[in-house]
């Protein structure tokens, strides 16, 4: 099948994009990127109905590509490289010399460069200092931006969200999951989600308690130097689960009844 994505738009929510890369250009040298919303840049013009970040249009990107200093016109970058890699695989153009072509090499490209999560959220969830981390509110706003952009351009839209989390029940009932589901049910909308990529990280554990009073111990290894960590326990209704903690030196906490809104502070000698 000679399907190259012509006539559709693929939107990426990620670390940004190297818009100067030739793989994102047409044969005449113009950019295939229809727009970029850089949530980290507060110096430019925000998109309509949004109150932060800077939007750069296809005209501005083409102007930058013709300039001796493109970053003075469109100061968008991808320090991490993940967003550029993802866009290359999904929508990169043909490179005959390298024997490469993206899956949808003629699709229009739209990009949301997500801003990092706020410091208080990173601290609350124990996120490592150098870890790439985004908050759901910015992701939701990015999805809305792509949806409105596709409506404006009258294009079918594929939302590419190659982000992951170890939090939540992974049952499709979180706020973000429901929002993604609502977009996927719209005409001319498709949602692509990255999954897995955990390999042998052992971030998850599943157990089964068959009898009342049955106990199952789980060892949690916390990286040296961490000041805290977050763990979630998920059960099935109507079962009630209790837990206790054993410190590395052997102190054991009282049994904790896990109820909504409960808070406990435990001090070990």
What are the language-model segments listed below?
Residues 209-223:
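Non-catalytic, beta-strand-enriched accessory regions in extracellular/secretory proteins
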Residues 2-135, 154-155, 188, 226-229, ...:
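Subtilisin-like serine protease catalytic core
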Residues 22, 246-248, 258:
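Surface loops and adjacent helix of pleckstrin homology
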Residues 118-209, 225-253, 262-264, 268:
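Substrate-binding/access-modulating region of protease and related hydrolase catalytic domains
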Residues 26-32, 177, 209-211:
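Glycine-rich, phosphate-binding/catalytic loops in enzymes
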Residues 44-58, 254-269:
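Exoplasmic/lumenal beta-rich domain surfaces
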Residues 215-217, 251-258:
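Short Trp-Ser/Thr-centered turn/loop motifs at beta-strand boundaries
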